[in-house]
Regions:
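Charged, amphipathic alpha-helical coiled-coil/dimerization segments
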Residues: 83-142
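Generic structural concept
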Residues: 18-25, 48, 52, 107, ...
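N-terminal helix-turn-helix DNA-binding core of bacterial DNA-binding proteins
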Residues: 32-73
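Alpha-helical linker/hinge and terminal dimerization helices associated
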Residues: 24, 28-35, 70, 110-132, ...
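C-terminal regulatory/oligomerization modules of transcriptional regulators
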Residues: 1-13, 138-163
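N-terminal leader segment of winged-helix/HTH proteins
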Residues: 1-43, 112
């Protein structure tokens, strides 16, 4: 099946593309919202541990900055941050001279969970890549990644314009 516009008047290809893209988005969203134990015997949502990972990579990040980086509303980020704090994975800190702005940091438990998460994602990505290489060439996979990267940029721009 060709998923790009070949110039003919038949829109079937574009409908197939839109259908697959919608299904991919739904399945990926379900996966992100699912709860999983990454190896610390404390199940957590994938989206929460992804936010935790961003906090560890950006010590002192604020909810506003996290919201922009993750293209999510401040309310959504605040809710996730509260869950991470309740779980003992992060802590909040105000800096002297600016009691309004709260900075976020990972705890040792948060750092351990992030290490487990990165190991899980690395293993899962390798497994998926191995399966895809059975039916796709490396060139096709690279093309998909390029298109996906550009698609993310378009969606991010649209999100930023709506915010």
């Amino acid at each position: 099946v060709q998923y790009y516009n070949t110039g003919d008047k038949d829109s079937t290809n574009l409908i197939a593309y839109a259908s697959d893209l919608s299904m991919f988005a739904m399945l990926f969203t379900d996966m992100q919202n699912g709860t999983r134990d990454y190896g610390n015997d404390r199940p957590i949502k994938s989206v929460e541990v992804a936010i935790l990972s961003t906090i560890e990579q950006n010590p002192g990040i604020t909810v506003s900055d996290l919201s922009q980086k993750q293209h999510r509303t401040k309310g959504t980020i605040s809710s996730i941050v509260s869950n991470l704090e309740k779980g003992g994975y992060i802590y909040r800190e105000k800096r002297p001279g600016n009691a309004k702005v709260v900075h976020l940091y990972t705890t040792p438990d948060g750092e351990r969970l992030n290490t487990l998460y990165i190991a899980f994602v690395t293993k899962k990505t390798a497994e998926i890549q191995s399966e895809l290489l059975k039916v796709c060439s490396i060139s096709e996979m690279n093309s998909f990644c390029k298109v996906l990267h550009e698609y993310v940029k378009l969606l991010s721009k649209a999100f930023d314009e709506e915010s």
